[in-house]
């Protein structure tokens, strides 16, 4: 049965198109523009590399801990559900969810901090902007242009992942100069759903992994205002449930509560502001997709709790320091010895110093955790994270 979209949903038939005209010579199959965007993401090398990029745990001891790839799939599942209920475009939502983490360097935020420092005199590094740089420049499988030539709506949604942008960095400015994305306005509801779905998945699945790893205490978790009502509901329904099944039920229930809260709040905002069409969404005074005030407050408190108790856990810090060392040494090595770069990266060696620094960071940022260690062993010497 064909979905009846809301009047303010993104419509592939009304897409602003792609930067490069692809013509009609190739067989496209029965796919609309946003479905093709999604498929290009899934078939990209950058997407495949997410399998070996860290979510929380570097060099995890268990095969069940999440990585960027599994996180992206979970974000997409949540995003499609929310989009379906709100009668938005599921295909664009899914594509944005799948692509949102492509710009993460090896070892996650640890690696990002090193790359920011490496480019401090060349415009800095931001993983959100780097996602777009990958998709518009670095990932280049086509014969007539660089990048995946994604739709305007896809690029806009990735650029404004967290809302309007007043001061874009160099990487985002380059994309905007080539294909103006109206950076100071709000993105589509589909992009807003993707961002919220990332928060829901991030909070719950990192909690799941942290509990399973024994790094955070369940009693402290269930005392958090975000989790306490869910815990009470689960314990009332299943008073004898323990262990892994108890954690699984807690996570399942918490995701549902956050999804339902976001649906109620988004409907309330739409009813109040009364947008008719997609251009109205872009000119709204605030995001249309979001949590209630209480959920927003509790979710922020929970993030603070997770940073203190999980992301900066003493067991993780020594590995994080070693990972930082690996990335910083690799950047320094290729800066001093660019001939150690792969041949295709040497062939595209820039003429000026700023672009050379960015070129090296592009290469290192594209590495997986595994490949960064492999290149360190190959080019510098033996080194173990744990």
Swiss-Prot record:
Q: Which organism is it from?
A: Zymomonas mobilis subsp. mobilis (strain ATCC 31821 / ZM4 / CP4)
Hydrolase in keyword set: yes
- Coiled-coil stretches noted in the UniProt entry, renumbered to this chain: none
SMART domains the UniProt entry points to: HDc
Query: Which keywords belong to this entry?
Result: Hydrolase
- Tell me what this protein is called: Deoxyguanosinetriphosphate triphosphohydrolase-like protein
In this protein, which residues make up the domain named HD? 68-203
GO BP, one annotated term: dGTP catabolic process
Xref: PANTHER family: DEOXYGUANOSINETRIPHOSPHATE TRIPHOSPHOHYDROLASE-LIKE PROTEIN, DEOXYNUCLEOSIDE TRIPHOSPHATE TRIPHOSPHOHYDROLASE
């Amino acid at each position: 049965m064909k979905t009846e979209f809301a009047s303010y949903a993104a419509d592939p038939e009304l897409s602003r198109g792609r930067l490069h005209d692809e013509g009609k010579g190739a067989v496209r199959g029965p796919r609309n523009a946003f479905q093709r965007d999604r498929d290009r993401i899934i078939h990209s090398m950058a997407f495949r590399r997410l399998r070996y990029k860290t979510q929380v745990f570097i060099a995890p001891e268990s095969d069940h801990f999440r990585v960027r790839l599994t996180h992206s799939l979970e974000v997409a599942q949540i995003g499609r559900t929310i989009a379906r209920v709100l009668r938005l475009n599921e295909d664009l939502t899914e594509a944005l969810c799948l692509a949102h983490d492509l710009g993460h360097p090896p070892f996650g935020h640890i690696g990002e901090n090193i790359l920011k420092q490496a480019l401090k005199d060349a415009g800095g590094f931001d993983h959100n902007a780097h996602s777009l740089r990958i998709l518009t420049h670095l990932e280049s499988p086509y014969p007539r242009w660089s990048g995946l030539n994604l739709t305007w709506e896809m690029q806009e949604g990735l650029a404004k992942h967290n809302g309007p942008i007043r001061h874009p960095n160099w990487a985002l400015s380059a994309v905007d100069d080539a294909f103006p994305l109206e950076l100071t306005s709000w993105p589509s509801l589909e992009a807003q759903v993707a961002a919220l779905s990332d928060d829901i998945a991030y909070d719950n699945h990192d909690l799941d992994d942290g509990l399973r790893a024994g790094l955070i205490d369940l009693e402290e978790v269930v005392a958090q205002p975000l989790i306490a009502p869910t815990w009470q509901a689960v314990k009332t329904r299943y008073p004898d449930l323990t262990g892994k099944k108890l954690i699984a039920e807690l996570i399942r229930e918490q995701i549902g509560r956050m999804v339902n809260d976001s649906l109620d709040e988004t409907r309330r905002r739409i009813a109040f502001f009364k947008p008719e069409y997609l251009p109205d969404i872009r000119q709204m005074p605030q995001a249309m997709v979001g949590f209630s005030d209480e959920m927003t407050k509790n979710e922020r408190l929970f993030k603070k709790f997770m940073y203190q108790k999980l992301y900066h856990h003493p067991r993780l810090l020594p590995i994080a320091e070693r990972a930082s060392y690996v990335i910083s040494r690799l950047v320094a090595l290729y800066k001093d010895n660019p001939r150690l770069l792969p041949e295709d990266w040497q062939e595209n060696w820039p003429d000026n110093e700023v672009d050379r620094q960015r070129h090296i960071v592009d290469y290192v940022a594209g590495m997986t955790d595994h490949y960064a260690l492999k290149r360190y062993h190959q080019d510098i010497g033996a080194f173990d994270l744990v």
